[in-house]
Amino acid sequence: MGKGPILACAESNVAVDNLLEGLVNIGVNAVRIGKPVKVRESLRNSTLDALIEQHPLQDEIEYIKQQNDDLRKDLNSLKGKEKGLAHRDIKNNFKDIRNLEKNVIAALLDSAEVICATTIGAGHHILGDRKFPIVLIDEATQASEPSALVPIIPVSY
């Protein structure tokens, strides 16, 4: 297709896990959005959280976080201009961390063939204003009308 990943949803976490399991078993690059504790243990490596932890930029993010921790520890001993510069560095580091995390998430979602989520989870801010060429709702008759609209209204084109 070339227009980005498909969004595959279901009302329950169990149903989403069943979708994800089937996709993973046939070799589809699928990413599961949602809290990892609600995802079947055998599928947790396909969660966005797990993929973020494994991403090569995660080392850089951790390094910057460690720099911030070190700077914060030293703040009490700093005075005047040095303290102001340290605060500026901490603020800039937080911006860098946020940008790196956004880039990692965007790269992971862009590279997926299918993004899996519950119908309500499809409204998660992490998907932002992302558009999908196809939105699939498995077992749609089991979903309430309001929850079935969440993946359809803001994200499809």
What is each PLM-predicted segment?
Residues G2, P154-Y157:
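Short glycine-dipeptide loop
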Residues G2-C9, V14-V135:
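Conserved P-loop NTPase motor core of helicases/translocases
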Residues C116, R130-A148, Y157:
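SF2 helicase catalytic motif II
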Residues I120-H124, E145-A148, I152-P154:
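GG-anchored amphipathic helix commonly corresponding to the ABC/SMC/Rad50 NBD signature/C-loop
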